[in-house]
């Protein structure tokens, strides 16, 4: 009886050891709840170091002097931690810029940490236009799963400009690509105005089979009202997906939703460095 108990105990120890080894090897396996935040952030920091060596540190540059000069983000100017697949662990979003032109803005890249390595799950052309001068930004949409998707905008024509949208993110099978059932919305036309007024046009996604964007009517607002609406989007106090700004300075238009700034990039790199 004693020998049988000893054998059972030994088997139990071996099984437990195997389960622990499995969790250590891949913390995404079912039943494993290993907290690898320190290792994850340390690995992400090394990736940021690699990119700052290639493209430079986050900075705000200018193409001239005086009130007419355009400012733009340069170097690794978008660095964001976000749990895109709603698994409780952050992915890393990176984008770099080499100058005041869309042609010089690099791809948006999404990295995850799996089996002790940083893996690039996506590298592609997202809505990498700019706002507030030439600070690159990414547009993010909250999914019903609790995760997030990046919005890809494609522009056609001029006066009016036609935009089409595609959401890309993690699907239920773990692949990164167009979101099933919510991949796109109809095109929308925008005409640029020479008016000096400010305005907003708010968008939300319809529930269900996700085939429709629901635009609100155009609203002219004061700059103070615009700033308040902008703040509510940035801080997540509203469920609005996009906020469009129309101004008279060259008719520039930009989507402003959860804007990633140079300051945020610097702060995120510092946060990752603390774990390294």
Q: What residues fall within each predicted segment?
A:
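Positively charged n-region of N-terminal signal peptides that target proteins for export
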Residues: 1-9
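Acidic, small-residue rich beta-repeat scaffolds with periodic aromatic anchors
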Residues: 27-40, 145-276
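Beta-propeller blade repeat segments, especially FG-GAP/WD-type strand-to-loop junctions
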Residues: 105-122, 166-172
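Blade-edge motifs of beta-propeller repeat domains
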Residues: 31-73, 117-132, 249, 254-265, ...
């Amino acid at each position: 009886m004693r020998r049988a108990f000893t054998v059972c105990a030994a088997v139990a120890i071996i099984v437990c050891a195997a389960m622990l080894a499995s969790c250590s090897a891949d913390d995404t396996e079912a039943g494993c709840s290993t907290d690898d935040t320190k290792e994850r952030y340390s690995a992400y920091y090394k990736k940021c170091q690699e990119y700052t060596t290639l493209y430079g540190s986050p900075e705000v540059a200018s193409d001239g002097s005086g009130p007419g000069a355009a400012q733009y983000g340069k170097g690794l100017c978008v660095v964001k931690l976000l749990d895109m697949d709603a698994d409780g662990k952050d992915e890393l979003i990176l984008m770099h810029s080499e100058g005041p032109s869309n042609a010089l803005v690099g791809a948006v890249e999404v990295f995850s940490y799996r089996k002790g390595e940083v893996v690039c799950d996506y590298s592609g052309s997202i809505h990498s236009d700019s706002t507030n001068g030439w600070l690159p930004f990414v547009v993010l949409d909250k999914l019903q799963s609790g995760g997030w998707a990046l919005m890809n905008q494609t522009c056609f024509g001029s006066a009016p400009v036609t935009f089409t949208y595609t959401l890309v993110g993690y699907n239920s099978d773990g692949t990164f690509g167009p979101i099933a059932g919510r991949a796109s919305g109809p095109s929308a036309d925008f005409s640029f105005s020479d008016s000096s007024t400010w305005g907003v046009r708010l968008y939300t996604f319809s529930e269900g089979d996700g085939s429709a964007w629901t635009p609100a009517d155009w609203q002219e607002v004061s700059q103070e009202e615009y700033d308040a609406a902008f703040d509510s989007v940035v801080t997540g106090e509203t469920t609005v997906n996009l906020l469009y700004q129309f101004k008279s300075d060259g008719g520039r238009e930009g989507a402003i939703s959860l804007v990633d700034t140079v300051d945020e990039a610097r702060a995120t790199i510092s946060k990752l460095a603390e774990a390294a």
